[in-house]
Amino acid sequence: MGLFDRGVQMLLTTVGAFAAFSLMTIAVGTDYWLYSRGVCKTKSVSENETSKKNEEVMTHSGLWRTCCLEGNFKGLCKQIDHFPEDADYEADTAEYFLRAVRASSIFPILSVILLFMGGLCIAASEFYKTRHNIILSAGIFFVSAGLSNIIGIIVYISANAGDPSKSDSKKNSYSYGWSFYFGALSFIIAEMVGVLAVHMFIDRHKQLRATARATDYLQASAITRIPSYRYRYQRRSRSSSRSTEPSHSRDASPVGVKGFNTLPSTEISMYTLSRDPLKAATTPTATYNSDRDNSFLQVHNCIQKDSKDSLHANTANRRTTPV
């Protein structure tokens, strides 16, 4: 991708990280996750008696507190009691565990921490652009934060639907508030930012690999254009071709030809004669020697005469031999 595309992706990642962290922080810190009808209890102590006044009104609650919206105790907030004294948890251990997780709110808090760390990684990737693993770490943090967020939302819904202190009519008369939707929106944005950050890392990794391959190709082509390298390569190719070609020195000689009739042992082959080694070593070309040539001609003529005489004798013998 081009520089403009990378800039747009980085801008979207930064804005998304800030939005996801802000939405989740607001959702965890506010008390508008659920609207339902409940009882606001107050306890007043006088000199002689303790009076309790119970009133069923519309309430809004968050992860830790419940606040009254109407009645005499409008605006009054109290801590949520996830383990009331009149409830029996021995019969259902799963419900007790669910209430414990709901009371701790560990998953929403963990989501906020992971979103914060992912935002730090995105900010660090702007200053350390050569370290591409930072943006990958940011993507992993955001994906993990989204998963932790959705687990916390599921636990909250399950705990609210299975609350035994509420009657069936009260369980059906509730609605989720804007804090709940902020948390759900934070989950969606966190997952999108995580996927985008991982995509940016993969894109940058591909560009680095393509650049490295192009550099290696240019270096290799530059080496092949060096004259000394080409000369060594040509010499090596020539030597290898010479070693693979068959030798024709023996086949070209008259002695090695199949069916060649060699001269008799009494005759001297002209091919075996060589020049004088002393003269051949001292002079580049052989000089004419009349004495040696005359003796050579005399010897050659004698050999021819002897061969003719032996030939006539053999013919006479053949004629006189009775059949």
Swiss-Prot record:
InterPro entries per record: CACNG_subunit, PMP22/EMP/MP20/Claudin, VDCC_g2su, VDCC_gsu
The keyword Transmembrane belongs to this UniProt entry's keyword annotation: yes
Main location: membrane
Modified residues (Phosphoserine): S253
Membrane topology: Multi-pass membrane protein
Phosphothreonine carried by residues: T321
Location of this chain's protein in the cell: Membrane; Synapse, Synaptosome
KW Transmembrane helix (keyword) present: yes
Keywords: Calcium, Calcium channel, Calcium transport, Glycoprotein, Ion channel, Ion transport, Membrane, Phosphoprotein, Synapse, Synaptosome, Transmembrane, Transmembrane helix, Transport, Voltage-gated channel
Membrane-crossing segments per the record: 10-30, 104-124, 134-154, 182-202
A GO CC term attached to the entry: glutamatergic synapse
One Pfam family, short name: PMP22_Claudin
Effect the entry attributes to changing V323A: No interaction with DLG1 and DLG4
Expression sites by tissue: Brain.
Region feature (Disordered): 233-261
Modified residues (Phosphotyrosine): Y271
PANTHER family: VOLTAGE-DEPENDENT CALCIUM CHANNEL GAMMA SUBUNIT, VOLTAGE-DEPENDENT CALCIUM CHANNEL GAMMA-2 SUBUNIT
Function: Regulates the trafficking and gating properties of AMPA-selective glutamate receptors (AMPARs). Promotes their targeting to the cell membrane and synapses and modulates their gating properties by slowing their rates of activation, deactivation and desensitization. Does not show subunit-specific AMPA receptor regulation and regulates all AMPAR subunits. Thought to stabilize the calcium channel in an inactivated (closed) state.
Disease linkage: Defects in Cacng2 cause the stargazer (stg) phenotype. Stg mice have spike-wave seizures characteristic of absence epilepsy, with accompanying defects in the cerebellum and inner ear.
Family recorded in the similarity comment: Belongs to the PMP-22/EMP/MP20 family. CACNG subfamily.
Subunit details: The L-type calcium channel is composed of five subunits: alpha-1, alpha-2/delta, beta and gamma. Interacts with the PDZ domains of DLG4/PSD-95 and DLG1/SAP97. May interact with GOPC. Acts as an auxiliary subunit for AMPA-selective glutamate receptors (AMPARs). Found in a complex with GRIA1, GRIA2, GRIA3, GRIA4, CNIH2, CNIH3, CACNG3, CACNG4, CACNG5, CACNG7 and CACNG8. Interacts with GRIA1 and GRIA2. Interacts with MPP2.
Name of the molecule in the record: Voltage-dependent calcium channel gamma-2 subunit
Organism: Mus musculus (Mouse)
Name of the encoding gene: Cacng2
